[in-house]
From Swiss-Prot:
GO terms for biological process: riboflavin biosynthetic process. Keywords: Riboflavin biosynthesis, Transferase. Forms an icosahedral capsid composed of 60 subunits, arranged as a dodecamer of pentamers. This is 6,7-dimethyl-8-ribityllumazine synthase. HAMAP family: Lumazine_synth. It catalyses: (2S)-2-hydroxy-3-oxobutyl phosphate + 5-amino-6-(D-ribitylamino)uracil = 6,7-dimethyl-8-(1-D-ribityl)lumazine + phosphate + 2 H2O + H(+). The gene is ribH. The lineage of its organism: Bacteria, Pseudomonadati, Pseudomonadota, Gammaproteobacteria, Alteromonadales.
Amino acid sequence: MNVVQGNIESKNAKVAIVVSRFNSFVVESLLEGAVDTLKRFGQVADENITVIRVPGAVELPLAARRVAASGKFDGIIALGAVIRGGTPHFDFVAGECNKGLAQVALEFDLPVSFGVLTTDTIEQAIERSGTKAGNKGGEAALGLLEMVNVLQELEQQLQD
C-alpha cells in the first residue's frame, strides 16, 4: 500500500502571506503566529516569506490570485478576521472570501491555507488569535507546510 503524506519541515518553501488590514488588532497576532510557525517548525528562511497587505478580507482572493499567477511561491496563507455585526454583510464577506481563496487553490494547483477568522464576537476573534483557543494563524501555517510537502510527494509518486 502506498501512503502519501507530508511533513512540516519545508526549508526551501517560498511562502506568501496575504494579510487583511481590517481588524488589525486581531490579524497582526495571526500574522505573528503564522511567521513564527513557518520559521520554527517549517525552518522557512526569512527571505522566503513575503507578506502582502490588503485592505480587507474581500480583497484577499484577488491578491492571492496575483501571487499564485506569478509562479514564484509554493503556497499562500490568507489571514484576516471577519466579525459578525448587526447586518448580513458578514455572510457576504466571509462567503466570498472563502469561495475566492478556494478557487485560487484549484485554478493554480497551489496550496492556499485559510487563516481567516469568521467569528460572532470580538472576544471569539481574540481567543483564536493567540489566547485561549490557540493561534489560528499558526495553524494555517502548519496546514500550508504539510500541503506543500504532500503535493511535492504526490508529484513524485505520480511520476514513478
